[in-house]
Structures are given as structure tokens and as C-alpha cells.
């Protein structure tokens, strides 16, 4: 195993109240689903150890309240995030239309060093509902994601555990890449040439 230090990845889940943020988190971490979650007050988090490319990392997944009156709690929760997950309900057009403001809210509150490259993942949840109730097509959601810099997009059912594992695999990978970029980026903006052309003593083992 690698002797590199253990990595803690902070992931924030945002979206309107009732879109299934808590359900997604619980399905991924605990493999459980409940149809009777109460609205999250403030924020709550769960942790899960996962392997990303043979590297063991701990994901700290924050589930934040979707109610507007709790959005002011943001700064403390958003700071230090390595990835932001934007969740909407495919059967609720209002929750989809709110994604833009959730994304903007996150970028303002979290103040990532490089907002343009900060990793987001979009999840359209509740695909287990009747097709006739669906209000947001996959095409419309994908068009939105492409317009925001090709954000990865997943359609999930937290209830039936559809695509949840796959979505969080990409979330973990994106978060780790962001964490490493922050760790090694420092305050340098110019690329560093890692190929040293000078001769070195010793064997090339």
C-alpha cells in the first residue's frame, strides 16, 4: 500500500428541498432507503472510505438543507469542498431550474481558487417514478451540463439504488483530482516542468 498520507475529501450535496439529497447519501453510504426522511435542518454529513485508483480515501459527504432560510449557513459548510453535487428531481421542473442558482451560491460561498475548473456533478434523481410524471428530459439536462463546461451527469433512483454507486464513483474521482490540484498547486499559476534534464549520480533503479 502507498505510504502517502490519508486523504479526506469533502463533498457537498446541494439542491432544493425534497429532491432526495439525504436519500442519495444514505443509499450510497449505508445501502438503505427510507421514504420518511424529515427535512434536513442546517447540514449533516456521513463518511465513507473508498478506493480511488487503488488509493484509500475518506469521503465526507455533506447533506445541506434545501430550504432558502438555511442557505445563509453556507460559508462554513462550503469552504474546503473538493466537489459539489447538484441534485434535482426529474419530475420537478422548478428543482431543475434552481440548479443554476445553487451552483452560483456554491461558487460565491466556497470561493474556490479556480472556479472555472472546480468539479461539479449533476444528478437527476427519482427516475423510478412513472415516465408520464417526468418533466425534465435527459437531453435538456445534458444540454445544461454541457453549457457549464461538460459537467458529468447521472440519472439516479435513490429508492432503487440505480446509478448511485456509479455517480459517487465519479464524484470521488473528481474530488480527489481537485484535492491533489489544491495540494500541489500552491500559489503557482505557471505549469512546472517536472522533467529535469540535468545528469544525476547513482543508478536508475
Swiss-Prot record:
Task: State if DNA repair is listed as a keyword.
Answer: no
Protein activity control = Rab activation is generally mediated by a guanine exchange factor (GEF), while inactivation through hydrolysis of bound GTP is catalyzed by a GTPase activating protein (GAP).
InterPro entries named in the record:
P-loop_NTPase, Small_GTP-bd, Small_GTPase
Q: Which UniProt keywords apply?
A: GTP-binding, Lipoprotein, Methylation, Nucleotide-binding, Prenylation
Record bears the keyword Lipoprotein: yes
Residues bearing a lipid moiety (S-geranylgeranyl cysteine): 203, 205
- Where in the sequence is Cysteine methyl ester found? 205
User: Which sites bind GTP?
Assistant: 17-23, 33-40, 66, 125-128, 157-159
Q: Which Gene3D superfamilies match?
A: P-loop containing nucleotide triphosphate hydrolases (3.40.50.300)
Cite the effect that the entry attributes to residue 22 to N.
Constitutively in the GDP-bound conformation. Causes loss of function during vacuolar morphogenesis
Pinpoint motif Effector region by residue range. Answer: 37-45
**Gene Ontology CC entries for this record:** fungal-type vacuole membrane; late endosome; vacuolar membrane; vacuole
Q: What happens when the gene is disrupted?
A: Displays highly fragmented vacuoles.
Q: Where is the signal peptide?
A: none
GO BP terms: endosome organization; regulation of vacuole fusion, non-autophagic; vacuole fusion, non-autophagic
Task: Name one matching Pfam family.
Answer: Ras
GO terms assigned for molecular function: GTP binding; GTPase activity
Describe its function. Ypt/Rab-type GTPases are key regulators of membrane trafficking and intracellular vesicular transport. They act as molecular switches that convert between GTP-bound and GDP-bound states, and regulate virtually all steps of membrane traffic from the formation of the transport vesicle at the donor membrane to its fusion at the target membrane. In the GDP-bound state, Ypt proteins are predominantly cytosolic, solubilized through the interaction with a GDP dissociation inhibitor (GDI).
Which family does the record claim for this protein? Belongs to the small GTPase superfamily. Rab family.
Supply the PANTHER family for this chain: RAB FAMILY, RAS-RELATED PROTEIN RAB-7A
Q: What is this protein called?
A: Ypt/Rab-type GTPase avaA
**Source organism:** Emericella nidulans (strain FGSC A4 / ATCC 38163 / CBS 112.46 / NRRL 194 / M139) (Aspergillus nidulans)
Name of encoding gene = avaA
Amino acid at each position: 500500500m502507498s505510504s502517502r498520507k490519508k486523504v479526506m475529501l469533502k463533498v457537498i450535496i446541494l439542491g432544493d428541498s425534497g429532491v432526495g439529497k439525504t436519500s442519495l447519501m444514505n443509499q450510497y453510504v449505508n445501502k438503505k432507503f427510507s421514504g420518511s426522511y424529515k427535512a434536513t435542518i442546517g447540514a449533516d454529513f456521513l463518511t465513507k472510505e473508498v478506493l480511488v485508483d487503488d488509493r484509500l480515501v475518506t469521503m465526507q459527504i455533506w447533506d445541506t438543507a434545501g430550504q432558502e432560510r438555511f442557505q445563509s449557513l453556507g460559508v462554513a459548510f462550503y469552504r474546503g469542498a473538493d466537489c459539489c453535487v447538484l441534485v434535482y428531481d426529474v419530475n420537478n421542473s422548478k428543482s431543475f431550474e434552481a440548479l443554476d442558482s445553487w451552483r452560483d451560491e456554491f461558487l460565491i460561498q466556497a470561493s474556490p481558487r479556480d472556479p472555472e475548473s472546480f468539479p461539479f456533478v449533476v444528478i437527476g434523481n427519482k427516475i423510478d417514478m412513472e415516465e408520464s410524471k417526468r418533466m425534465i428530459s435527459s437531453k435538456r439536462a445534458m444540454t445544461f451540463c454541457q453549457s457549464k463546461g461538460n459537467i458529468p451527469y447521472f440519472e439516479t433512483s435513490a429508492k432503487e439504488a440505480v446509478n448511485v454507486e456509479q455517480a459517487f464513483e465519479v464524484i470521488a474521482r473528481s474530488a480527489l483530482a481537485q484535492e491533489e490540484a489544491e495540494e500541489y498547486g500552491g500559489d503557482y499559476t505557471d505549469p512546472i516542468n517536472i522533467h529535469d534534464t540535468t545528469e544525476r549520480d547513482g543508478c536508475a533503479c
